[in-house]
């Protein structure tokens, strides 16, 4: 067993079953090891930004990390934009970056670079393995770090000689570091605050927008009438008919300010206070009303789902929310295509429990309006604002949930960044329908 084989077997032992790869010479022993160690599915990507974006989509849908395999510092640099998006989404990823052999670094060959320096802004954990015998334990720690609440990018730098030299054995999975528990005192205090008659908003993010978390939020709304909101680019939300309705915060700062006007208490569940996406002259960046009190039920690293359930119980809320989104399908339009008619077609024809990898950008408003009451679905938006994510996100989502339809509504500009994802979709025979909007907002003329 060499270092690469011990690495792959350790990843498999730790529950990692998919690797999005754009390898080069330094990673060839990893590639060769894929033929001898079973259990890790390699997915070839023609560009590193596709690999990192696909790992994000996979992690958001599967709830567990995929691995990436990137070639040296420049390869990592090519993938940084979508690692930025994944960091903002708190997606678990094991980011394996090959490097020159340890003894070769002293010669400063052309591709030598500061890999850790590239990785630092997007990683929650970084480590350079020192030898083949250390690879397995380092990989187990990387998976543990990626899985640690709320989820993060663990970058493991793999020198070529650590991959090809003999290793002893694979490592087993380390215990997960789960979310911190919200104290009973915090639950009690917030239950009292929610009974004070003030105009209250609850801002949800993360697992509070899916499954049991969303249901618990609905119970609280049924009891107190609290307004349920989510971030503009909440990374993973369950939306549509039969679901608890949650309002999405709009994009522009002045719209956010108008939406929140009069709010006296804002309760955060895995979220941060809303701010303007960009700064504009004479426009506020901070969108929370001046006299609004900010209250944290759960920080991102804390168990927001259990906190919501405990808060619902403390309030004496009903066991189920009485408010559900009704199904409303718009029918098929006639006439020419525009952002509204395309949104109507998508909402009408997409089946139940589809996954939307959404980078429709400037065409998004009609689509979000149509999807709000469409068939139940999962919505994965551009979580970090760096365009060129939608197509790779769809690749990862389709591999994580092969039994579900994936739809990728995408602006033309961002799609041009990572169009290589279409090749991976075809090669892997993925069930993805891609709709490219001719937004033409840039209107660049050469």
Language-model segments: which ranges?
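Active-site nucleophile and cofactor-binding loops and adjacent substrate-binding regions
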Residues: 21-24, 43-53, 68-75, 130-131, ...
């Amino acid at each position: 067993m060499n270092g690469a084989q011990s690495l792959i077997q350790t990843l498999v032992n730790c529950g990692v079953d998919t690797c999005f790869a754009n390898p080069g010479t330094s990673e060839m022993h990893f590639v060769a090891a894929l033929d001898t160690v079973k259990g890790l599915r390699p997915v070839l990507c023609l560009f590193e930004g596709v690999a990192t974006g696909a790992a994000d989509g996979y992690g958001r849908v599967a709830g567990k990390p995929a691995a990436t395999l990137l070639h040296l510092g420049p390869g990592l640099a090519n993938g940084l934009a979508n690692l930025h998006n994944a960091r903002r989404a708190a997606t678990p990823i094991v980011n394996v970056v090959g490097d020159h052999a340890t003894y070769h670094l002293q010669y400063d060959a052309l591709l030598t670079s500061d890999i850790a320096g590239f990785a630092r802004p997007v990683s929650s954990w970084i480590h350079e393995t020192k030898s083949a015998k250390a690879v397995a334990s380092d990989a187990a720690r990387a998976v543990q770090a990626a899985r640690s609440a709320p989820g993060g990018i663990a970058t493991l730098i793999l020198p070529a000689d650590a991959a090809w030299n003999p290793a002893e054995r694979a490592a087993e999975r380390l215990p997960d570091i789960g979310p911190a528990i919200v104290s009973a005192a915090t639950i009690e205090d917030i239950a009292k605050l929610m009974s004070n008659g003030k105009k209250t908003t609850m801002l949800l993010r993360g697992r509070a927008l899916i499954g049991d978390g969303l249901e618990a939020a609905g119970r609280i709304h049924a009891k107190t009438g609290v307004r349920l909101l989510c971030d503009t680019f909440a990374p993973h939300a369950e939306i549509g008919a039969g679901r608890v309705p949650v309002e999405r915060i709009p994009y522009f700062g002045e719209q956010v300010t108008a939406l929140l006007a009069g709010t006296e208490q804002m309760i955060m569940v895995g979220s941060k206070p809303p701010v303007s996406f960009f700064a504009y002259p004479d426009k506020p960046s901070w969108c929370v009303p001046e006299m609004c009190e900010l209250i944290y039920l759960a920080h991102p690293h804390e168990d927001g789902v259990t906190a919501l359930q405990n808060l619902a119980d403390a309030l004496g809320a009903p066991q189920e929310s009485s408010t559900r989104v009704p199904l409303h399908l718009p029918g098929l339009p006639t006439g020419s295509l525009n952002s509204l008619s395309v949104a109507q077609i998508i909402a009408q024809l997409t089946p139940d429990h589809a996954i939307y990898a959404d980078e429709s950008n400037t065409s998004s408003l009609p689509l979000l309006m149509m999807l709000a009451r469409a068939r139940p679905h999962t919505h994965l938006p551009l979580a970090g604002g760096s365009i060129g994510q939608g197509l790779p996100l769809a690749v990862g989502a389709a591999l994580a949930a092969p039994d579900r339809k994936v739809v990728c509504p995408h602006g033309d500009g961002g799609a041009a960044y990572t169009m290589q994802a279409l090749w991976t979709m075809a090669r892997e025979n993925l069930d993805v329908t891609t709709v490219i909007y001719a937004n033409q907002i840039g209107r660049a003329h050469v």
